[in-house]
Amino acid sequence: MVCLGSGCEPRAVGDYLERLVDLNGLAVFVQTLLPAFNDAVGEAWASGRLGVHMEHHYTEAVRQTLYTGLAKLRASNAKPRVLITTSPGELHGLGAMGLQVALAVQGAHCVSLGTQTPVEEVVSAAVSMDICVVAISASVNQPPQELLAYLVALRKSLPPPCRLWAGGRGLLALDGQLPQGIDHFQSVEEAVAAWRLLLHVS
């Protein structure tokens, strides 16, 4: 994003993102534009072309934009209900929040537990809230084998009818390693399409 370069005004990023939402709609923003922006910012940060403070500034601007979008959506209690979080040690939550907004636009009832939720807490929430899908978002910063162990433990602990979804660039390192019962989605669009299918059978 050009507006993250040197001399960027504090409000410029937020204003730019809000204009994109107004022009394209919230669904297109979270399913198409936001993933591309997140990848570009992550790569720029990893290569040293973007300072930590600007990466944090971008993250907060996105959060505020998504919070604003969520606040405008009508609350839903419809099934299938989706619980969204990240594994312990995974602080990056933009992917999870983007999925939450994308599903909420479709009318889904989403429960966000924020980031870094232990297995036992996810399971407890899923059971008590009658959750149909648990969705885990993972960035490239998450050690692959730690992520795999977390997903396997979740699958073993969740009630069999509860589906377990996983997505984000952190899953790329686990290609072919995910056991049966864990659905890997490579894009927000795929997850939204899967939720729509569940909607018709719930």
What residue spans do the PLM features occupy?
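C-terminal regulatory/effector modules of DNA-binding transcriptional regulators
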Residues: R49-G51, H56-S202
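Long amphipathic alpha-helical segments
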Residues: M1-R74
